[in-house]
Amino acid sequence: MSMIPRLLRRMAAVLAGLALLLVALAVSYRWVPPPGSPLMAIRLAQGAPGIDRRWVPLDAISPHLVAAVVASEDSRFCTHHGIDWDAVEAARDHNEAGGRLRGASTLSMQTAKNAFLWPDRTWLRKGAELGFTLLIEATWPKRRIAEVYLNLAEWGDGIFGAEAAARRHFGKPAADLSAQEAALLAAVLPNPRRWSPERPTAYIRNRAATIERRMAIVRRDGLAACILDPA
């Protein structure tokens, strides 16, 4: 009988060690670029011929793309601490009213998912995402969260990060993206393997136009100031 408590203690020690290792890894990414992401490995396993991913510092990414992503994905990024409770409440009310299912994922949550987790909708994955979100919000500055997000986001089959996306879709570095190009890239983020910024459908063109209008609000109200103009 004494073997069971001993086994449980060993399992607890292993789990605690694994948790500490993951925390140390997450904290290290404040300074060290992630070498890849679980989704990149999944895409390779699914048969992608390769991964086009070129890490660049945030200063080498057009401010237009920063504004576009904030406008389309998380307009309160600079003011929340990982979870946008207003968006959560709005999504709940919308879904309860019978509208098309809407999420409330913030840029911080998407960064946590992209850097550490697999694409899934299980409660286990969601719980892990919440934990990593709170961890990076506590240990990374907002500017770093945005930098990692923009370098890990998927923008097409085997295309990851703003630099690879800009070069593959528009033939230019991410630093030179125009406002219109940035809006198109942001417009396809919900499903970048289905939609293309190079050959936008009418829906994507309309979505990009809406994002461009919101980008003006982002600039006017300083909604991306924590990324573009940190104190």
Curated annotation (Swiss-Prot):
Its main location: membrane. GO terms for cellular component: peptidoglycan-based cell wall; plasma membrane. Signal peptide: none annotated. GO terms for biological process: cell wall organization; peptidoglycan biosynthetic process; regulation of cell shape. It is an enzyme of class 2 (transferase). GO terms for molecular function: pentosyltransferase activity; peptidoglycan glycosyltransferase activity. It is a single-pass membrane protein. The chain crosses the membrane at residues 12-34. PANTHER family: BIOSYNTHETIC PEPTIDOGLYCAN TRANSGLYCOSYLASE, MONOFUNCTIONAL BIOSYNTHETIC PEPTIDOGLYCAN TRANSGLYCOSYLASE. Peptidoglycan polymerase that catalyzes glycan chain elongation from lipid-linked precursors. Belongs to the glycosyltransferase 51 family. This is Biosynthetic peptidoglycan transglycosylase.
